[in-house]
């Protein structure tokens, strides 16, 4: 079974989807990579960063983890 880590990084005017594909056969290896990605997201400079671990059928293995970093705070 393959696992995919989907990373969504959003800046003020763009949203980028970064998809490092993890082809480990072990869920433990995929989970390890998932937690490493979460740790990187926690210190990411982008305002919004979401990470989700999916199985090969696109089903979420873990619920999305989101980090919303501080910004100007103004909403219009």
For the regions a language model picked out, list residue spans one by one:
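A short, charged, amphipathic alpha-helix used as a generic interaction element across diverse proteins
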Residues: 15, 24-49
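Solvent-exposed serine/threonine-rich low-complexity stretches and specific carbohydrate-binding patches
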Residues: 20-25, 64-68
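Generic structural motif
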Residues: 11, 27, 56-57
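Hydrophobic beta-strand residues in large extracellular and virion-surface proteins
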Residues: 5-6, 34, 51-53
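Short aromatic-glycine-(Arg/Gly/Cys) micro-motifs in beta-strand/loop hairpins
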Residues: 1-19
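Short, mixed-charge low-complexity intrinsically disordered segments
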Residues: 39-76
């Amino acid at each position: 079974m393959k696992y995919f880590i989907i990373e969504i990084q959003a800046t003020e005017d763009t949203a980028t989807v970064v998809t490092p594909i993890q082809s480990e056969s072990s869920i433990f290896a995929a989970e390890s990579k998932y937690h490493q990605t979460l740790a990187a997201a926690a210190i990411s400079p982008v305002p919004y960063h979401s990470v989700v671990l999916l199985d090969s059928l696109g089903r979420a293995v873990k619920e999305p983890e989101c980090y919303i970093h501080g910004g100007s705070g103004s909403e219009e």
